[in-house]
Amino acid sequence: MTKQEEIIKEIILAARKIQDFLWGEPNKNWGLEEWKRMFRKRIVKIDDIDPANPHAVIELKKRLLQNAALSVALLIRLDNGLPGKENVDVVPSNLPEYAD
């Protein structure tokens, strides 16, 4: 593993710890639709990055790391089974604008 890959790995692991600290309990209660909304929101934010912005690459890396942290959180959640509809109303969505 290159030094850069090692750093990226450490960042993703740290992001996962932060994600779990902030959202550990709600993660257990969100249904699959809420997870989809979270990913849609990140994709919209990636689409909104202006390539002319001198900080576009940094912004893209930040958004990709957020997606990586979400992916890891969902992978861990999947160890307990697929989040189902039974969880949909437990925690109200804070991302209703990203619903299907």
Q: What name fits each language-model region?
A:
Residues 1-100:
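Flexible "arm" and connector segments at domain edges
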